[in-house]
Amino acid sequence: MSFKKSAEISWFAPICDGDDDFLGNRNPLYKSSWENTCKIVQTADKLGFKNVLCPSSFQVGQDSLSFVAAMTNQTKDINFLPAIRCGEIHPPMLARTIATIDHMVKGRLTLNIISSNLPGENLESKKRYERSKEVIQILKLFWSKDFVEYEGEYYSFKLPSDPAKPYQINGGPLLYLS
């Protein structure tokens, strides 16, 4: 019996500037910009890469969700993996934004959930992961219910959610946690 081995290769969209500091002298050609990053992602798409990670930074660089939305008509096959820092965007708005983008890319969307501190915060790890857990619960509720009533430690609201449903009918985009 033989097993076929396969590997899924992803690419990195340098939408956050400054990640190349550790490479030595910074090359101005690699500075984060819409034009440069768009070309990189289009090339990765043409070369058959499966995914592209779109990182998030609250200090410098482009916004990952805005970048992915803008790239929808610039690519054909590549799956987008934007990093989402929990707590940065109000969860009902985040659910609606993600559902909209998921329709724009026709399901070529996976989410990288980040549980880091926000600017000026110094929450212990446990609290950050609890907040992320609430955000994930809220996203799932907004993607599956027409009205959401939620009471948690970090968020509390009663809001309609229709029609903020993702393109992917299996409960929304796949989530990676980091």
Role assignments for model-derived ranges:
Residues R131-F142, F157-P166, L174-S178:
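Extended catalytic-interface subdomain
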Residues C54, A83, L111-I114:
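Short beta-strand and adjacent tight-turn residues that come in two discontinuous sequence segments
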